[in-house]
Amino acid sequence: MRKDMLLEKVEVLVKPIVEELSYELYYLEYVKENGEYYLRIYIDKEEDSISLNDCEKVSRRVSEILDVEDPIEDSYYLEVSSPGLNRGLYKEEHFKKFIGREVLVRFNGSLEGMKKIQGILKEADNEFITVQGEKKLKIPTEKIKGANLEGEI
């Protein structure tokens, strides 16, 4: 099964559980590192930071449904974590939530002679984000290789 299809299937199973426990499903990833597969579930909540107890609670509940539904053929490790201080920004809603914050954006190829820009996120929609660094740059979302918050929350 293709990775994107696998993650969609896992999200359908996991998201209702995460939300039922009053968390936000921030991001899912399925990766192979050093010969081992990992399903990583990043959770967040509005009013407070994520604790180890929060991760354990979600891990137990998600583990139960994944064991029953068994959407992943390979053996894997399940990890539940917070997105962290320098969290990745993957979706339009992530970019919109952090307008006004400092970000680092890396490009696919180069854009106006640059491979990346660090600055304040000024605008975001599904087609472009605007970052004010050394200069103001309007970045097409398809040119974004990766983006994350910088600095302190």
UniProtKB/Swiss-Prot annotation:
Gene Ontology biological-process annotations: ribosomal small subunit assembly; translation
Subcellular location: Cytoplasm
InterPro entries found in the cross-reference section: Ribosome_maturation_RimP, RimP_C, RimP_C_sf, RimP_N, RimP_N_sf
GO cellular component entries: cytosol
Key words of the record: Cytoplasm, Ribosome biogenesis
Function noted in UniProt: Required for maturation of 30S ribosomal subunits.
NCBIfam families named among the record's database cross-references: PRK00092.3-1
Similarity comment text for this entry: Belongs to the RimP family.
Protein name, as recorded: Ribosome maturation factor RimP
Species of provenance: Clostridium botulinum (strain Eklund 17B / Type B)
